[in-house]
């Protein structure tokens, strides 16, 4: 019984460390949510989608966004590449 608990604990620790390592490699501004903002503009932009692990296009309204907002795919990939 004690060996099973230790094995389970090791698995959990390994998973936690691997998640921490991946998130540490991605710049913090790239982990922000894709924010359309509160204005009604229509500006195609790119942002890093953490769940997909890549830059994706989204529509930015023109104000109140965040730093995960790039004018083109290349800028996003250069800033958020792992």
Curated annotation (Swiss-Prot):
The keyword Transmembrane does not apply. It is found in: Secreted. One of its GO terms (cellular component) is extracellular space. The record marks 40-41 as: Reactive bond for trypsin. InterPro entries: Kunitz_BPTI, Kunitz_BPTI_sf, Prtase_inh_Kunz-CS, TFPI/VKTCI-like. SUPFAM superfamilies: BPTI-like (SSF57362). Its main location: secreted. Residues 1-24 form the signal peptide. Expressed by the venom gland. One of its GO terms (biological process) is negative regulation of fibrinolysis. Gene3D superfamilies: Pancreatic trypsin inhibitor Kunitz domain. Coiled coil: none annotated. Residues 30-80 form the BPTI/Kunitz inhibitor domain. Pfam families: Kunitz_BPTI (PF00014). Keywords: Disulfide bond, Hemostasis impairing toxin, Protease inhibitor, Secreted, Serine protease inhibitor, Signal, Toxin. One of its GO terms (molecular function) is serine-type endopeptidase inhibitor activity. Disulfide bonds join 30-80, 39-63, 55-76. Negative results: does not inhibit chymotrypsin, factor Xa, thrombin, and tissue plasminogen activator (t-PA). PANTHER family: KUNITZ-TYPE PROTEASE INHIBITOR-RELATED, TISSUE FACTOR PATHWAY INHIBITOR. Belongs to the venom Kunitz-type family. Serine protease inhibitor that inhibits plasmin (Ki=2.01 nM) and trypsin. Acts as an antifibrinolytic agent. This is Kunitz-type serine protease inhibitor Bt-KTI. It comes from Bombus terrestris.
